[in-house]
Amino acid sequence: MSMAYEEYMRQLVVPMRRELTGAGFEELTTAEEVENFMEKAEGTTLVVVNSVCGCAAGLARPAATQAVLQNDKTPDNTVTVFAGQDKEATAKMREYFTGQEPSSPSMALLKGKEVVHFIPRHEIEGHDMEEIMKNLTAAFDAHC
């Protein structure tokens, strides 16, 4: 790929990253950052696998941020990796999603290192934001 294309893509996704980091999500951009986080992670963690697609922009990111900001029970940690952008970090995080097919966007609620709830792309695409938020908040209420 050309350097101009890579720079264009880096700039294009800045607001997509900020939508989550601005709501308090920690962005993990390397495999090492994922490993370091997962080694020390305690309690519950919501992981958002971010994406450039429309269902990430219109549904996944807003549902994740609003669920975390509005629900009484929330995860101890909120982190994000960006599929297609931070490939090694995303691949490393997906290693922890045992039994789940790679999907972006997607969301995983972990207790320690174990996935206790997973929302793949097909449960995001074609659903409205409120449905996705209810899916997340029900998981928060059950596990956080």
Curated annotation (Swiss-Prot):
Signal peptide: none annotated. Pfam families: Disulph_isomer. The modification S-bacillithiol cysteine disulfide is found at C53. One of its GO terms (biological process) is response to oxidative stress. Induction: Expression is up-regulated by cumene hydroperoxide (CHP). S-bacillithiolation is the formation of mixed disulfide bonds between protein thiols and the general thiol reductant bacillithiol (BSH) under oxidative stress. BSH is an equivalent of glutathione (GSH) in Firmicutes. This protein is a dithiol bacilliredoxin, which debacillithiolates (removes BSH) the S-bacillithiolated OhrR (OhrR-SSB) in vitro and in vivo NaOCl-generated S-bacillithiolated MetE (MetE-SSB). Involved in maintaining redox homeostasis in response to disulfide stress conditions. Has a redox potential of -130 mV. Displays weak protein disulfide isomerase activity in vitro. NCBIfam families: YphP_YqiW. This is Bacilliredoxin BrxA. It comes from Bacillus subtilis (strain 168).
